[in-house]
Amino acid sequence: MGGKMKAIVKNENAFGATLKEIPIPSINENEVLIKVQAASICGTDVHIYNWDQWAQKRIKTPQVFGHEFSGIVAETGKHVTNVKTGDYVSAETHFVCGTCVPCLTGKHHVCTHTKILGVDTAGSFAEYVKVPARNVWKNPADMDPAVASVQEPLGNAVHTVLESSQLAGGSAAIIGCGPIGLMAVAVAKAAGASRIAAIDKNDYRLALAKKLGATITISADKEDPLEVIDTLTGGEGIDLVCEMSGHPAAIAQGLKMAANGGRFHMLSLPERPVTVDLTNDVVFKGLTVQGITGRKMFETWRQVSHLLESGLVDLTPVITHQLPLEDFEKGFDLMRKGQCGKVILIP
């Protein structure tokens, strides 16, 4: 295709990013070039923007980042048959090898050689982005581009919540009400949970959790989550605890509040080792602890589509800000302060 485009680039090994003009990516015979309509800011992007310890170890500058997006196919490689120019799409952002043991046994989401869009390859905070054709997901023509751009993080929430087979009529606790935690509240409601506790220190996000279906919100700064959960459940504990915060104290509390025989699903990424009481909080309780990474390909995407198209999940309350790409610094400031749900950048 050729030409130039605007993109947000992590240009230096320091805080912040730069809006630059760079070449439009060229594609190979199995790739697709997409004109980005909407790109949402993820917690991973904030790590990169802040240049924290994780980013310093993981990111090689210069790097175009961003990975949650929707757009229109602008060009296809000569071997691509599953999509065509003009198709309205989003994409699975974990690029897998297809040849390792996990891939060959259907566990693509834990591929040994995963590469991530906007982390290992040029990302979607740009006017154009390229992805492998096999990663492209076609969107309904009437889906709002902002909503279409957040299907990937909704997939994280869906994977976290729906791994439990015992949620209908049961109880769920969502610890950490960032955007994916908020989505998990909505998914738990759609899955039939009768009691949903949302736990955070941010009153703004707890209010959003209430709108999305939380039956009780717990401000961890103002009350003891374990005491509230004990009262709420009559001492029985929570059937499914979803840990989205990554804070060591919250992780330990989450294990304690889980019911005997319950489940503890962890999507969060603690920045340091966590000390927990495995004997009493896991072994003697018969607790199932499961790490969650990415989305099952493409089972989770089908679940996401069903939840959105059926109206069982409405992400309108989660999408709180839409800004032009040029105002990315304002978007990152909102994310860093926690005074937002999902922030969408429009190229």
From Swiss-Prot:
Role: Catalyzes the NAD(+)-dependent oxidation of L-threonine to 2-amino-3-ketobutyrate.
Biological process, per Gene Ontology: L-threonine catabolic process to glycine
Catalytic site: 44 (charge relay system), 47 (charge relay system)
Coiled coil feature spans: none
Record-listed NAD(+) binding positions: 180, 200, 205, 267-269, 292-293
Annotated residues for binding of Zn(2+) 1: 42, 67-68
Site (Important for catalytic activity for the proton relay mechanism but does not participate directly in the coordination of zinc atom): 152
Cofactor(s) in the UniProt record: Zn(2+)
Residues that hold Zn(2+) 2 according to the record: 97, 100, 103, 111
PANTHER family for this protein: L-THREONINE 3-DEHYDROGENASE
Entry's localization field: Cytoplasm
Gene: tdh
SMART domains hit by this protein: PKS_ER
Record text on subunit structure and interactions: Homotetramer.
Gene Ontology CC annotations of this record: cytoplasm
Protein name per Swiss-Prot or TrEMBL: L-threonine 3-dehydrogenase
Matches recorded under InterPro entries: ADH-like_C, ADH-like_N, ADH_Zn_CS, GroES-like_sf, L-Threonine_3-DHase, NAD(P)-bd_dom_sf, PKS_ER, Zn_alcohol_dh
Reactions performed catalytically: L-threonine + NAD(+) = (2S)-2-amino-3-oxobutanoate + NADH + H(+)
Disulfide bridge positions per record: none
Annotated NCBIfam families: PRK05396.1 (NF003808), tdh (TIGR00692)
Cofactor binding note: Binds 2 Zn(2+) ions per subunit.
Presence of the UniProt keyword 4Fe-4S in the record: no
GO MF annotations in UniProt: L-threonine 3-dehydrogenase activity; zinc ion binding
Family (UniProt): Belongs to the zinc-containing alcohol dehydrogenase family.
